Amino acid sequence: MAKEPMRVLVTGAAGQIGYALVPMIARGVMLGADQPVILHMLDIPPATESLNGLKMELVDAAFPLLKGIVATTDVVEACTGVNVAVMVGGFPRKEGMERKDVMSKNVSIYKSQASALEAHAAPNCKVLVVANPANTNALILKEFAPSIPEKNITCLTRLDHNRALGQISEKLNVQVTDVKNAIIWGNHSSTQYPDVNHATVKTPSGEKPVRELVADDEWLNTEFISTVQQRGAAIIKARKQSSALSAASSACDHIRDWVLGTPEGTFVSMGVYSDGSYGVPAGLIYSFPVTCSGGEWTIVQGLPIDEFSRKKMDATAQELSEEKTLAYSCLN
């Protein structure tokens, strides 16, 4: 029995990440090889031609799972009936811009898109915010879409999570699929805390802690953390543009695990609405370790937190509280 198509919105679809993400969705990478999709692509009016070109390419690729395409600059049309919304569109920080300027631009974007989603999206729409500042954009979206359940509004830290797994696999010369349960705590920014204290590697003699195998606490507590924190900047330096392919791939991972579930014994990182777990202030969108089942995420509870971790977790929470204050000041 063929499944009903799911409607997936990508905002900022004509941009770099959109160009990498849209074919992944159309191929079934995000929702599964048996799940038909109807793509809704939104961008701003100056990108109309580019958006139409993307639509032409999607037609030309003849994706079997792609059952329809809505390409539009109208936010209401874009949001109507969508089951999944991936918010890639935002206002990027340009040289010489103050953080407050960027924040106020994004606050107005996310305020209007929140209203459109609230009024027109499918009832249990799942939202993933990718555009920076991702955690705070997601918080604004939550504020202005009160009827969307708060558990349905998330932000992307899976890219950082995957970067952490990648660094460990390179260091130990193992397959990345054999590394699991790294954690990204906090903000999708350079204050995030990549934590390996609970991470393990599959070896011929069973699962072993990453700390034990790396056997270099100095590296794990300094270079590993800063490499993951600064990876986005390193890619901009190398490519002269921001990471698009890896961001798109991790957005698919985030939604796929959320919708289809995480493997037994594995947790992943998602930016979700804090309930006060691990002493993180409630009312922030903060990256936690989660497991997913039946289309719902649950924060992994009871992990021991050492003093080193506590400081880092508090520092990134502090930054998020400051961003929240800044964002709210832009509303007035």
Swiss-Prot record:
It comes from the Eukaryota. This is Malate dehydrogenase, cytoplasmic. It catalyses: (S)-malate + NAD(+) = oxaloacetate + NADH + H(+). It is found in: Cytoplasm. It comes from Oryza sativa subsp. japonica (Rice). One of its GO terms (molecular function) is L-malate dehydrogenase (NAD+) activity. GO terms for biological process: malate metabolic process; NADH metabolic process; oxaloacetate metabolic process; tricarboxylic acid cycle. PROSITE patterns: MDH. Signal peptide: none annotated.
